[in-house]
From Swiss-Prot:
It comes from the Viruses. The keyword Membrane applies. This is Protein PB1-F2. GO terms for biological process: symbiont-mediated perturbation of host apoptosis; symbiont-mediated suppression of host cytoplasmic pattern recognition receptor signaling pathway via inhibition of MAVS activity. Keywords: Apoptosis, Host cytoplasm, Host membrane, Host mitochondrion, Host mitochondrion inner membrane, Host nucleus, Host-virus interaction, Inhibition of host innate immune response by virus, Inhibition of host MAVS by virus, Inhibition of host RLR pathway by virus, Membrane, Modulation of host cell apoptosis by virus, Viral immunoevasion. Residues 1-27 have a biased composition (Polar residues). Residues 1-34 are annotated as: Disordered.
Length: 90
C-alpha cells in the first residue's frame, strides 16, 4: 500500500516523516513542519509587540504631571481609542 505524502495540512505537530534508507528499510522520525515553526515564531513576535505597546502606553500615562481630572480622562480616552484601532488593524 502506498503512503500518502505528508503535508502540514494532513499532519499535526506530531508530523512523521518517513524516509527510505539505502537498503530499502523505512525509518520514522518525529519532525515539526517548517510552516508550523514559522507560525509559532510569528505568534511569539506578535505577542511581544502587543505587550511592548501596552507598556509604552501605560508609561506615558503614568508620566503625566498633575493633570486635571477632565484633561486626564480626555487624553486617556483618545489614547485608548487609538490603541484599540491599531489592534484591530493588526
Amino acid at each position: 500500500m502506498e503512503q500518502e505524502q505528508d503535508t502540514p495540512w494532513t499532519q499535526s505537530t506530531e508530523h512523521i516523516n518517513i524516509q527510505k534508507r539505502g537498503n530499502g528499510q523505512r525509518t520514522q522520525r518525529p519532525e515539526h513542519p517548517n510552516s508550523i515553526r514559522l507560525m509559532d515564531h510569528c505568534l511569539r513576535i506578535m505577542s511581544r509587540v502587543g505587550m511592548h505597546r501596552q507598556i509604552v502606553y501605560w508609561k506615558q500615562w503614568l508620566s503625566l504631571k498633575s493633570p486635571t481630572q477632565g484633561s486626564l480622562k480626555t487624553r486617556v480616552l483618545k489614547r485608548w481609542k487609538l490603541f484599540s484601532k491599531q489592534e484591530w488593524i493588526n
